[in-house]
């Protein structure tokens, strides 16, 4: 390379941008969600929920596909398809007259309802969603169990027991704090009453002391007055006696 010729190596900034576009920003795959298990009674209906997350806006070409694999079977068959805004029920299988579309693509919902359940409906249902250009992702499966009478699941019973215990504990705590509040309030009222009584006694004793203080000079004055009156009376009597002696 001649001196002063421009370098042909890529710019470090361009290389970093290329690396980030290829490695740090991979295409996000669509994610599909369903229940893990659902239960239904013979002759009733059950809703198979299906929703999804996509990095793209909901496309007009969005599609939902439901497949069914019987219990113990190996092959899955298509039983429902939604595309171009229209639901299509496959004519193959026993669900063709029992499936109802209840989904709403604008809310990313592809749910269906199966009516008139039978024991033969036990199996696995698979929901597949395509939201072009986001078409890469995994499907989601839900297993249907049909019983003559839907049993109470262990999780529901356990949750009810735990909820009951927590309710009792909260009730006991509430009762404890209520009793404690009433006791403290009563103690405060009693304390205020005692304080008022003490203040009343203090004021009464103060009034009595001041009253006695005011009465003491009066008593002394009355005593001095009686003494002086008595002395004057004695002096007068003595003078009268002396005058009588002089006359004699």
Swiss-Prot record:
GO terms for biological process: cell aggregation; cell-cell adhesion via plasma-membrane adhesion molecules; cell-cell junction maintenance; myelination; negative regulation of apoptotic process. Pfam families: Myelin-PO_C (PF10570), V-set (PF07686). This is Myelin protein P0. Gene3D superfamilies: Immunoglobulins. InterPro entries: Ig-like_dom, Ig-like_dom_sf, Ig-like_fold, Ig_sub, Ig_V-set, Myelin_P0-rel, Myelin_P0_CS, Myelin_P0_Ig-like. Residues 180-248 are cytoplasmic. Belongs to the myelin P0 protein family. Homodimer and homotetramer. The keyword Transmembrane applies. The modification Phosphoserine is found at residues 210, 226, 228, 233, 237, 243. Residues 222-248 are annotated as: Disordered. It is found in: Cell membrane. It is a single-pass type I membrane protein. Is an adhesion molecule necessary for normal myelination in the peripheral nervous system. It mediates adhesion between adjacent myelin wraps and ultimately drives myelin compaction. Disulfide bonds join 50-127. The keyword Transmembrane applies. N-glycosylated; contains sulfate-substituted glycan. Residues 224-248 have a biased composition (Basic and acidic residues).
